[in-house]
């Protein structure tokens, strides 16, 4: 399905409501994330590469917070012939409906089970790969460790978690510098000062980024044997953890 241009915050609002993944956002999401998240295309492509390396025959692959299915599509193209099943989960009905249309545009022998629900309620089992692509940051902080435990318990030995997140930096000058670079990235992609300001206000109470150290500690506490950042641009990073 073709994505419209993101102009959701182009006109001034008297009061900016909290960001939610509703039908309006789903309709412009491809354009929004491409113009807002530096390196997003590279992350999606590399998730497919990682799936090719880590997906084991007859295993399950989970895309938790699948949105329109970009990561699922990238994975599905790279795991054909392995009898894998992909479980793609999102709590937005609008996202799931558009994801279904996007997936149906391509023929594949790898089945995808679409689930509209809370990722905290999903049973994870026999997983060779679990993807959290800019999802954890929207989950209440007190639920993040328990979700990681569920993922760890459901992964096969040697299984891979891909975790992409916006990061917060405790060093104030580093935080402000990387934040400024990100805002310049959005300006270069055509967003106005009004759009940037209103979008930021809408996300203020919804998205709660962690520091890289918080991610490291949480993953180590859960028992993952290896962890690394494989991609970072400004204050956006993608990490891998191996069980």
From Swiss-Prot:
Classification via SUPFAM superfamilies: S-adenosyl-L-methionine-dependent methyltransferases
GO molecular function, one term: S-adenosyl-L-methionine binding
Entry EC number(s): 2.1.3.-
Record keyword Mitochondrion present: no
Residues noted as binding S-adenosyl-L-methionine in the record, renumbered to the chain: 40, 65-67, 90-91, 118-119, 133, 200
GO annotation (BP), single: tRNA wobble uridine modification
Keyword Transferase part of the UniProt annotation: yes
Regions crossing the membrane: none
Signal peptide location: none
Catalytic activities: prephenate + S-adenosyl-L-methionine = carboxy-S-adenosyl-L-methionine + 3-phenylpyruvate + H2O
Major enzyme class: transferase
PANTHER family per the UniProt record, alphabetical: CARBOXY-S-ADENOSYL-L-METHIONINE SYNTHASE, TRANS-ACONITATE 2-METHYLTRANSFERASE-RELATED
Function: Catalyzes the conversion of S-adenosyl-L-methionine (SAM) to carboxy-S-adenosyl-L-methionine (Cx-SAM).
Subunit composition and interactions: Homodimer.
Family named by the database record: Belongs to the class I-like SAM-binding methyltransferase superfamily. Cx-SAM synthase family.
NCBIfam families per record: carboxy-S-adenosyl-L-methionine synthase CmoA, PRK15451.1
Name this protein carries in UniProt: Carboxy-S-adenosyl-L-methionine synthase
UniProt gene name: cmoA
């Amino acid at each position: 399905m073709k994505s419209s241009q993101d102009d959701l915050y182009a006109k001034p609002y008297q009061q900016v409501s909290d960001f939610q993944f509703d039908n309006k956002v789903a309709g412009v999401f491809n354009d929004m994330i491409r113009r807002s998240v530096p390196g997003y295309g590279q992350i999606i492509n590399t998730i497919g590469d990682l799936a090719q390396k880590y997906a084991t025959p007859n295993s399950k692959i989970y895309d938790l917070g699948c949105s329109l299915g970009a990561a699922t599509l990238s994975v599905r193209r790279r795991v054909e012939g392995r009898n894998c099943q992909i479980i793609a989960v999102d709590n937005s009905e609008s996202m799931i409906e558009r994801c279904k249309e996007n997936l149906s545009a391509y023929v594949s022998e790898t089945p995808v089970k679409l689930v509209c629900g809370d990722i905290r309620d999903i049973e994870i089992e026999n997983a060779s790969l679990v993807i959290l692509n800019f999802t954890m940051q929207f989950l209440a902080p007190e639920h993040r460790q328990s979700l990681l435990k569920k993922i760890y318990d459901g992964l096969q030995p040697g299984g891979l978690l891909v975790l992409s997140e916006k990061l917060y930096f405790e060093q104030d000058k580093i935080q402000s510098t990387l934040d400024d670079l990100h805002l310049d990235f959005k300006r270069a992609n055509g967003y106005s000062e009004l759009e940037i300001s209103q979008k930021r206000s809408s996300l203020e109470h919804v998205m709660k980024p962690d520091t890289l150290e918080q991610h490291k500690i949480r993953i180590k506490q859960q028992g993952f044997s290896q962890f690394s950042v494989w991609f970072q641009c400004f204050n956006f990073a993608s990490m891998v953890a191996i069980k």
